[in-house]
Every structure is written in structure tokens, then in C-alpha cells.
Curated annotation (Swiss-Prot):
Taxonomic path: Eukaryota, Fungi, Dikarya, Ascomycota, Saccharomycotina
Keywords: Acetylation, Nucleus, Phosphoprotein, Ribosome biogenesis, RNA-binding
Ranges of compositional bias, category Polar residues: 1-16
Organism: Saccharomyces cerevisiae (strain ATCC 204508 / S288c) (Baker's yeast)
General function of this protein: Involved in the biogenesis of the 60S ribosomal subunit. May act as a specificity factor that binds precursor rRNAs and tethers the enzymes that carry out the early 5' to 3' exonucleolytic reactions that generate the mature rRNAs.
Subcellular location: Nucleus, Nucleolus
GO biological process: exonucleolytic trimming to generate mature 5'-end of 5.8S rRNA from tricistronic rRNA transcript (SSU-rRNA, 5.8S rRNA, LSU-rRNA); maturation of LSU-rRNA from tricistronic rRNA transcript (SSU-rRNA, 5.8S rRNA, LSU-rRNA); ribosomal large subunit biogenesis
Name of the gene: RLP7
Modified residues (Phosphothreonine): 120
The name this protein goes by in its record: Ribosome biogenesis protein RLP7
Top-level taxon in the UniProt lineage: Eukaryota
GO terms assigned for molecular function: mRNA binding; RNA binding; rRNA primary transcript binding; structural constituent of ribosome
Length: 322
């Protein structure tokens, strides 16, 4: 009788095979990730050593130094101007207002409408419509895409800190940002390194559904890892305290800039976008040249402290990158 009771206790205390298999898989994946991280660190060390021994021409050093000094001077001008605005010392400033310059391409075959000349400037040569407006300080939803900055420029420390704060460390990544009076000066500092625009609801939904990723730690997992956001149960588990139970609630909260906008925004990882043109073939090289020409028309750099923030048609850009 006692032997049968002992056998029952042993069967009850034994772990199911599924749990044991999950633990083995979790241990194996953890070891594989540690090995991959170790290999990545070793490759980075080798790359740093090879870059140290790399020959650098004197002309490239001079060009990089001059470009970086110009960029530092631009950021210094912007910082001084914003400091004067904060202290209300706008007597000797050309304009104490904040401006946004919206640049869009003309629609083919579109009829020219009568537009106020003070607010809109049109140039028939390049086929672009430029509309300069005054920012009134009202909150607005922006989508910011990190792009390559000016040629041969080492990003100054202040601009890099702002990019890190916005989680835009890598190129071809994007985040949602709520534009306010406090955010506007930061956008002026990082203007050469980003593309800014106001997304539509369809673009917001497409981004979150196709490229939404989060950091999640499941059961029997040693470390959190990045997963695709395609499970409403995970959303309810992580954001249920804020009244958000599905992906559609996240889309609505971001589109309307609700009370839980920052919670939803930081719950999502920065969106990793595709390159507009990739590859090294002859046709791809031609497309890259055309892309640079188009960017030179829309992305107009200015070293002036009072330069407006440039806004582009972000929906058309996301249609190419998403």
C-alpha cells in the first residue's frame, strides 16, 4: 500500500514533458544568443582594429573637420536663438516666430488654385509647392525618419543626444513624436539628420500592423527579446492597466494623441524601414542618382538659426519605405 502511495506522489511531483521541452528550448536559445553576441563583439573589435590601421587622406580629414565645425556652429546659433526666445529677448532677432516649411510635389495635371501669396510660394521650375506657415504651438502628430546627414560630418554631441532620446540612432528607422513648443527647438537641431511629416491614419495603421515590434519576455524565457506585435493578448497583458486591450487601441491612441500616447509610443520599438533603393546593379545606381537629386530638392539645408523646420509628404515616402 505504501509503495503505491509513493508511486502516486512521484507521478504527481513529476514535471510534464511539454514544460521540460520548453525549458530545454529556452536554455538552448539563451546559449545561442550568448554565442551570437560574443561573435558580434569579436567582429566589432576586429573592425575597430582594421579601421585604426586604415590609411586616411589629408583632404578627407580637412573636409570632415570643416563640415563638422560648420555643423557645430549651426547648432550653436540655434541654441543661442532659442535661449533668447526663452528669456523673451527678441528685440534684435529678425523674427521671434517659429515657422514650418511644407514642401510637396505638384500633382500631374492638377489645376492651379488661387492661393494666398503671403503663405504659399510656388516655383514652376522644380515642380514643387512650398507653403510656409507659422507654428502656433498646438500639439501635432509627426512621424520622423532618420536619414543620412550632410556629407563628411561627424554628428555633434548635442544632436546625437537628441537623436538618442528619440531612439533614432540607426538610419532608416522612424518614430512617432508629438510636436509641441518644447519639441520644436529639438527638431531644429537635428533637422539635417531626419525627415519630418504628418502621417495619415492609413499610414499609421499600415506601419503598426506591418512593422510593429515590441520587447517581450514570455514564460520560461530567461531574457526579454524582440517580437512582432500580432497578439492582442500580449497587448492586454502589457497595457491593460491603461485601458488598451488590442492593436487597434494602440493605433487609435497614437492617431488621436490620447492620454496614453507616450505609453503606447514607447511600448513600440522604432520602426525599421526598407531602403528606397538597394542593390549595386547599373539600374539601381541610376535610381540612387535620381533619389539624391530628389532629396536635394526637398531636403534644403540651411545654417541660419531662424531656418524653418521642413515638412515633407511623409505618406508618399512611407509608401516607398514600408
Amino acid at each position: 500500500m505504501s509503495s503505491t502511495q509513493d508511486s502516486k506522489a512521484q507521478t504527481l511531483n513529476s514535471n510534464p514533458e511539454i514544460l521540460l521541452r520548453k525549458r530545454r528550448n529556452a536554455d538552448r536559445t539563451r546559449i545561442e544568443r550568448q554565442e551570437l553576441a560574443k561573435k558580434k563583439r569579436e567582429e566589432q573589435i576586429k573592425k575597430k582594429r582594421s579601421n585604426k590601421n586604415k590609411f586616411v587622406r589629408a583632404e578627407s580629414i580637412v573636409a570632415k573637420t570643416l563640415a563638422t565645425s560648420r555643423e557645430k556652429e549651426r547648432i550653436k546659433r540655434v541654441s543661442i536663438l532659442e535661449d533668447k526666445k526663452a528669456k523673451n529677448e527678441t528685440q534684435h532677432i529678425a523674427s521671434g516666430k517659429d515657422f514650418i516649411l511644407k514642401i510637396t510635389e505638384k500633382a500631374n495635371g492638377a489645376e492651379e488654385n488661387s492661393v494666398d501669396l503671403e503663405e504659399t510660394e510656388e516655383e514652376e521650375d522644380d515642380g514643387l509647392i512650398r507653403e510656409k506657415t507659422t507654428y502656433d504651438g498646438k500639439p501635432a502628430l509627426l512621424f520622423i525618419v532618420r536619414v543620412r546627414g550632410p556629407l563628411a560630418v561627424n554628428i555633434p554631441n548635442k544632436a546625437f543626444k537628441i537623436l538618442s532620446l528619440l531612439r533614432l540612432v540607426e538610419t532608416n528607422t522612424g518614430v512617432f513624436v508629438k510636436l509641441t513648443k518644447n519639441v520644436y527647438p529639438l527638431l531644429k537641431v537635428i533637422a539635417p539628420y531626419v525627415v519630418i511629416g504628418k502621417p495619415s491614419l492609413s499610414s499609421i495603421r499600415s506601419l503598426i500592423q506591418k512593422r510593429g515590434r515590441i520587447i517581450y519576455k514570455g514564460e520560461n524565457e530567461a531574457e526579454p527579446h524582440e517580437i512582432v506585435l500580432n497578439d492582442n493578448n500580449i497587448v492586454e497583458e502589457q497595457l491593460g492597466d491603461h485601458g488598451i486591450i488590442c492593436v487597434e487601441d494602440i493605433i487609435h491612441e497614437i492617431a488621436t494623441m490620447g492620454e496614453s500616447f507616450s505609453v503606447c509610443n514607447f511600448f513600440l520599438q522604432p520602426f525599421k524601414l526598407n531602403r528606397e533603393v538597394s542593390g549595386f546593379g547599373s539600374l539601381n545606381r541610376l535610381r540612387k542618382i535620381k533619389q539624391r537629386e530628389a532629396e536635394s530638392r526637398t531636403r534644403q539645408f540651411s545654417n541660419a538659426a531662424t531656418a524653418p523646420v521642413i515638412e515633407v509628404d511623409i505618406d508618399s515616402l512611407l509608401a516607398k519605405l514600408n
